[in-house]
Amino acid sequence: MSDLVKVTLPDGSQKEAPRGTPVIDFVKGQIGPGLAKAAYFARLDGEPVDLSRAIERDARLEIVTTRSPEALEVARHDAAHVMASVVQKLYPGTQVTIGPAIEDGFYYDFARETPFTPEDLERIEKATNEAIKADLPFVRSEISMEAALALFEGMGERYKVEIVKDIAAKGAKTLTLYKHGDWVDFCLGPHGPSTGRIGVVKLLNVAGAYWRGDAKNAMLQRIYGTAFFDKKELDAHLAKLEEVKKRDHRRLGPQLGLFTFHEFAPGAPFWLPAGTVLYNVLEDAMRRLVLKNGYQEVKTPLLFNKRLWETSGHWGKYRENMFLVVDSESDPALPLEDRCSFSLKPMNCPSHHLIYRMDKRSYRELPVRYFTTDALHRNEASGSLGGLTRVRQFEQDDAHIYLREEQVTDEVLRIFELMKVVYGAFGLGFEATFSTRPEQRIGDDALWDRAEALLRKSLDATGLKWTLNAGDGAFYGPKIDMLVTDSLGRKWQTCTIQLDYAAPERFDLTFVGEDNKEHRPVVIHRAIYGSFERFVAILVEHYAGAFPAWLAPVQARVVTVSDRFEAWAREAGEALQARGWRVEVDASSDKLGAKIRNAQLAKIPFTLVVGEKEVEAKGVSPRRHGGEDLKTMPLEAFAELMTREATAPF
């Protein structure tokens, strides 16, 4: 065996180094000190490794620097380790559990009887940043599972012991440890070279979290934080978080009179008058769009016998998320025909399959596209409910398309065109993910192979860049999920396109082909908004409650300079209402400045001032939300402006 190894760099060039050379030494000696200084971790043949890892074989080497988001993710995991070590030093007896990097930050879960206070958080943050400055190296080692178990048992870390036992039960023989100073934890890594490379840490808040996400387990304390290499970047991020708080739909929704919740109906929103207008505008726009694109609207029952869900597979795979309304199967007092179970539907697809099956179908009819906005109910855990983004009762712009296999790619392209129209109207960017077969699924592997290959081909045909989300498909088929990007750069999952070969088999769905024989159709499940509730939450935060004129619950408010001008104000308001615009009149005794301010606070797109000159001109003086004053114009001219700016774009 040669004492030298060949290292292939990203540009294809090759260099030689003594076997066993640490990555960081290779970079310093063979590439240059600049890259070595910027390096945070590396990849050897695609595997993320520490910079201290020895190069033992010929390999491809990629250096990940602090300019990469991936390096920041590793640094945040480093920060979680440092924070945990500080917590155990400041609060002896605290048990550590898990502490991963997450989007935009990190957290660590602690078992401690006394709750952490805001003052504790400040103390921990200060000590964490001091520990970072100590610039202690992260040292990696591997030990046997037996030694790991003895180590953490000796430390009294019962949660770590539980995890070690689980890892051992899966067949692992060794465990990777990382140590900085005298504090040690296990994880896969990689980590940065030392604590001093992390940058600056800010702790954000403390929340409760059940051990392993199970409400039957102990309640832990989760400390959230974030880290950045540069304080300016941290400050910008904190400013963004403040803006996120201001835009929180849970705050703005009730403030703007859109929706509220009540303890008597957890997870089910009450849509207030303004919110109902917004909801209906969204629903009507989508209905117009799909009906002119070959869809047929249907409505089906909310309550179904469990036999439907047994046929669809939901009873076996999804029952814990369903609301069982009637359960009388074992009631001896009832006649046999009345002994049954009923549940509220969590999905529309099975009922649409029943409609498709009611008639004999020809290949000439396909695709058949059913659309609905029926209410759905899913039994989400109470702890997971949060505003409109996670609810128990909701509606979707739900559609199911029955078609021949060779029509799938064209149909996916049609759906993408609809999606671009919708997201473009709201100024939302988007990207795609492709989700493949999950562990819990129906249908054999051959069917899944076929479905995944076809949907991947269809996704490629759109020309969009996409990422793979392995194992996250629906239990009946692979799917494309769309992530929209809002005005704050946050990503939200909305549109889904799911390909289903299993339902036609389970429901015996057929069509008569050109050969006059029966064939199975393929089913596409698709939604563009996703749930209306979640989409409204996205829009509230995207627009900070200041909706565009076509979407706003109130599009214009007429305000009077004084009560002398009330007659024309009401006449103007009624004339605009007669044209279909959503207009209010404020002829209260408040001063004009207060009326304008109230309209601005209500985020109404246009405030129409009416005083003496407006009465004389039979017009209005519009002011846009945000303060731009338009010149006085005849009422007809403003109506034309509304036609241009307040007509639904789809």
From Swiss-Prot:
Key word Ribosomal protein present? no
Family assignment from sequence similarity: Belongs to the class-II aminoacyl-tRNA synthetase family.
Q: Which GO terms describe its biological process?
A: threonyl-tRNA aminoacylation
Where does this protein come from, organism-wise?
Anaeromyxobacter sp. (strain K)
Put simply, this protein is called Threonine--tRNA ligase
**Cofactor binding, per record:** Binds 1 zinc ion per subunit.
TGS domain: residues covered? 3-65
* Essential cofactor(s): Zn(2+)
Q: Where does Zn(2+) bind?
A: 349, 400, 525
Which compartment or compartments is the protein found in?
Answer: Cytoplasm
- What ranges does the record give for the region Catalytic, renumbered to this chain? 248-548
Note the PANTHER family from the entry.
THREONINE--TRNA LIGASE, CHLOROPLASTIC_MITOCHONDRIAL 2, THREONINE-TRNA LIGASE
GO MF, one term, reads: tRNA binding
According to the UniProt entry, what is the EC number of this protein? Answer: 6.1.1.3
Q: What does this protein do?
A: Catalyzes the attachment of threonine to tRNA(Thr) in a two-step reaction: L-threonine is first activated by ATP to form Thr-AMP and then transferred to the acceptor end of tRNA(Thr). Also edits incorrectly charged L-seryl-tRNA(Thr).
- GO cellular component terms, A-Z: cytoplasm
Subunit notes for this chain?
A: Homodimer.
Enzyme class, first EC level, given as a word: ligase
* Reactions performed catalytically: tRNA(Thr) + L-threonine + ATP = L-threonyl-tRNA(Thr) + AMP + diphosphate + H(+)
Q: Which UniProt keywords apply?
A: Aminoacyl-tRNA synthetase, ATP-binding, Cytoplasm, Ligase, Metal-binding, Nucleotide-binding, Protein biosynthesis, RNA-binding, tRNA-binding, Zinc
Q: What InterPro entries does the record point to? A: aa-tRNA-synt_IIb (IPR002314), aa-tRNA-synth_II (IPR006195), aa-tRNA-synth_II/BPL/LPL (IPR045864), Anticodon-bd (IPR004154), Anticodon-bd_dom_sf (IPR036621), Beta-grasp_dom_sf (IPR012675), TGS (IPR004095), TGS-like (IPR012676)
Query: Pfam families, from UniProt?
Result: HGTP_anticodon (PF03129), TGS (PF02824), tRNA-synt_2b (PF00587), tRNA_SAD (PF07973)
